[in-house]
């Protein structure tokens, strides 16, 4: 842009503020007016006057509308909207451009005013008081047709007007709300108020919950601070701590804000987590719908504790199974329920059955979805049976210690519970099938946080690979793409129905409060915030199948249902009797071990695996095996005495069988010894003569005998010297063509041993020996 000075614009004659301008010729004055008219700064003075007048008008409007508060602010927003901007205003680039134009216009106006003669100058406008805080607002302006050069592009001018500074809503530090658009916050607020109790709302999108674990002792010893704060049980504030010497990160936004359906602080119990997240899914499964609960988070964030828990505080899996059997027992009067479960894991991109370990399983797709071919399904009749199967599967699951977690899960575990409800409604059989999937994902981890160049690093790479595939599927579902990459991992293939199918899905994100794990916590919250936008298929109808039957078939179906119900009750009674038998046997063993002590009550007596059984009873609050000894009837005591007598008789019989077995072993040893002695005594003395066939086996045996007899050995220690009384076979004897051999035996064999020593000496040199000279 060319630069013009006052001297050049005035024809090279500067004016003084004290002296008047000299008179000039008419031609020269016309030239000067032509220069000023064609100059690009011409008209800025008029523009500044108009802006100042407009500013004064709006200043008066603001002063009059201060009592209205929000009404005045809305009027400014409406004025902004008339220009064509949206409700959020211009973006940062447009604001910068407008600000630069405004600052460029001020010195230009000053230059235009100084170029004018003193008598033509207008008095400057009164200075406005500086506002405490300014906000850029855009207004429309009617352009004068005679001043075309004063009209900016689009007819837009800029100015700044003071606004009332709003008080902060929370005493928290400055925070930035992520991935929340204009109406997203209101929608999430409405969904959060509804909670997880609305099953229809849960079917439209994935419900996301966040759980914060307490600070561990190791983190406290390391001097870590808490960087996570939960407000109103929904909002999560994440604060980043940085040192003052970290100059590259001083200007970064330290606060981050996330909003979820519900957030659990570190003081939340397992029962509260289950009632908020999973209890409604169990009810939906009984009605014939599918439900999925899975935990996500970094290693050591508390995923396994949330899903499995401990004996004192059981997790979501145990509480869901207990609640499921309780509700089935309450509703079994109007129909028949059957419960099947399977337990599998995804370890290093291979699917394995935890209840019956063997070779890896193959994933196949059918009408029901993705299934694992060859997976074992067990039919359970009580909570106790499910607990045994769950404990067996957890023992087969891969868990290894790492630098971060001593009991780190190295695989993704999936427990699937299939509930089938069958009832008779009029002349038809109604069957409802619901599936509940409880998934414990392995922890995402960095390679630096675990052991490098070991098996742990390979496992961590496969874990991160499957979680990355899961993130890709979530991003594709959020963006509404046609192709979802489910086949990139075995985990995503198994979760296909849970993510994009007709299923109620709940995700629990576990995070750590320590600032040492800030990166992992931030990634987990971003991942959960992204998963919040996944839309699943609405569950309008349940998985229900109606089969029409005739009257005769209806009677048969009723009979089948009654038999199945009776079978279930008998199985439960059998389980109780087995538990009682184990208790009685343990009591008998304890009384035999310490007869002088008084027998303890049956509730305190444990089986050989006493610790596990006692803890298992603490998990199942509704266990029907906790009957005290004082309430048992007399008939049961008589039965106990009969069982004790039977146990004693069996023990005596076992001792007798042991003695007989020892006696048989002794007789067997004596018989073997006699056979050996008889064999050695019946060996003829002629058999002790050496064979005349030089084989490798006979040579080795002859070497040992020669050491005692004083025979000479060759330097190679492989062949013995010939005995004077018995000569070795000749070349013809080895070939089997010797006449003496044929005459005696009448047949030719390569391994024949001559009965008599041949009279002719062999001319074949023995290896390692010199030729023998004939003695005449």
Swiss-Prot record:
Superkingdom of origin: Eukaryota
One protein family per Pfam: Kinesin
Span list, region Disordered: 1-31, 80-135, 590-611
Record lineage: Eukaryota, Viridiplantae, Streptophyta, Embryophyta, Tracheophyta
SMART domains: KISc (SM00129)
UniProt name for this protein: Kinesin-like protein KIN-8A
Species for this entry: Oryza sativa subsp. japonica
GO cellular component, one term: kinesin complex
A molecular function GO annotation: plus-end-directed microtubule motor activity
Any coiled-coil regions, as ranges: 554-592, 634-671
InterPro entries, A to Z: Kinesin-like_fam (IPR027640), Kinesin_motor_CS (IPR019821), Kinesin_motor_dom (IPR001752), Kinesin_motor_dom_sf (IPR036961), P-loop_NTPase (IPR027417)
Residue ranges occupied by any Kinesin motor domain in the UniProt entry: 205-534
């Amino acid at each position: 842009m060319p630069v013009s000075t006052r001297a050049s614009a005035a024809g090279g004659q500067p004016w003084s503020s004290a002296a008047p301008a000299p008179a000039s010729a008419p031609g020269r004055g016309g030239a000067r007016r032509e220069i000023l008219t064609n100059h690009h700064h011409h008209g800025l003075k008029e523009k500044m006057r108009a802006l100042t007048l407009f500013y004064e008008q709006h200043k008066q409007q603001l002063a009059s509308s201060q009592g209205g508060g929000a009404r005045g602010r809305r009027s400014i927003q409406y004025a902004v909207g008339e220009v064509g901007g949206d409700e959020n205003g211009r973006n940062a680039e447009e604001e910068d451009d407008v600000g630069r134009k405004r600052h460029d216009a001020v010195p230009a106006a000053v230059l235009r005013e100084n170029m004018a003669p003193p008598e033509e100058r207008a008095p400057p406008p009164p200075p406005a008081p500086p506002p405490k805080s300014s906000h850029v607002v855009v207004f429309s302006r009617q352009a004068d047709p005679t001043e075309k050069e004063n009209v900016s592009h689009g007819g837009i001018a800029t100015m700044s007007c003071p606004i009332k500074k709003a008080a902060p809503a929370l005493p928290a530090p400055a925070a930035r709300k992520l991935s929340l658009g204009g109406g997203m916050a209101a929608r999430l607020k409405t969904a959060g108020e509804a909670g997880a109790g609305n099953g229809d709302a849960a079917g439209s999108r994935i419900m996301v919950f966040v759980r914060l674990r307490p600070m561990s002792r190791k983190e406290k010893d390391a001097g870590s601070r808490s960087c996570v704060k939960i407000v109103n049980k929904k909002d999560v504030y994440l604060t980043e701590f940085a040192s003052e010497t970290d100059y590259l990160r001083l200007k970064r936004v330290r606060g981050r804000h996330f909003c979820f359906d519900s957030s659990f602080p570190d003081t939340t119990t397992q029962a509260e987590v289950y009632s908020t997240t999973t209890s409604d899914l169990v009810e939906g499964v009984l009605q014939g719908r599918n439900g999925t609960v899975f935990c996500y988070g970094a290693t050591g964030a508390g995923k396994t504790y949330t899903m499995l828990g401990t004996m004192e505080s059981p997790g979501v899996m145990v509480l869901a199974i207990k609640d499921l059997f309780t509700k089935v027992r309450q509703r079994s009067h109007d129909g028949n329920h059957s419960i099947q479960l399977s337990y599998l894991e995804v370890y290093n991109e291979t699917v394995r059955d935890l209840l019956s370990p063997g070779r890896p399983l193959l994933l196949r797709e059918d009408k029901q979805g993705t299934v694992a071919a060859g997976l074992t399904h067990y039919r359970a009749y009580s909570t106790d049976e499910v607990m045994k199967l769950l404990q067996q599967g957890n023992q087969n699951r891969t868990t290894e210690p790492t630098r971060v977690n001593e009991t780190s899960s190295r695989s993704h575990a999936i427990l699937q519970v299939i509930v089938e409800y069958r009832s008779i409604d009029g002349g038809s059989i109604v069957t409802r099938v619901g599936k509940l999937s409880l998934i414990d994902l392995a922890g995402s981890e960095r390679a630096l946080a675990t052991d490098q160049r070991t098996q742990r690093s390979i496992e961590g790479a496969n874990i991160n690979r499957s979680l990355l595939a899961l993130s890709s599927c979530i991003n594709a579902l959020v963006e509404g793409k046609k192709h979802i990459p489910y086949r990139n991992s075995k985990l995503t293939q198994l979760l296909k129905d849970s993510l994009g199918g007709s299923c109620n899905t709940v995700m629990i994100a576990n995070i750590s409060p320590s600032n040492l794990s800030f990166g992992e916590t931030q990634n987990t919250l971003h991942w959960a915030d992204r998963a919040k936008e996944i839309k699943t298929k609405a569950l309008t109808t349940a998985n229900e199948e109606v089969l029409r039957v005739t009257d005769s078939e209806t009677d048969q179906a009723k009979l089948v249902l009654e038999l199945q119900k009776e079978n279930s009750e008998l199985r439960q009674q059998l389980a109780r009797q087995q538990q009682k038998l184990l208790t009685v046997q343990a009591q008998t063993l304890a009384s035999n071990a310490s007869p002088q002590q008084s027998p303890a009550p049956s509730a305190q007596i444990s089986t050989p695996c006493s610790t596990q059984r006692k803890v298992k009873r603490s998990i199942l609050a509704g266990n029907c095996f906790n009957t005290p000894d004082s309430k048992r009837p007399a008939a049961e005591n008589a039965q106990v005495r009969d069982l004790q007598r039977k146990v004693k008789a069996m023990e005596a019989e076992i001792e007798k069988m042991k003695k007989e077995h020892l006696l048989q072993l002794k007789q067997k040893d004596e018989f073997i010894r006699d056979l050996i002695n008889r064999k050695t005594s019946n060996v003829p003395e002629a058999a002790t003569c050496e064979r005349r066939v030089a084989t490798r086996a006979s040579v080795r045996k002859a070497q040992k005998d020669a050491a005692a007899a004083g025979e000479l050995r060759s330097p190679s220690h492989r062949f013995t010297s010939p005995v004077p009384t018995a000569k070795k076979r000749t070349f013809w004897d080895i070939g089997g063509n010797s006449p003496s051999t044929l005459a005696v035996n009448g047949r030719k064999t390569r391994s024949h041993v001559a009965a008599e020593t041949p009279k002719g000496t062999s001319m074949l040199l023995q290896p390692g020996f010199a030729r023998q000279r004939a003695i005449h």
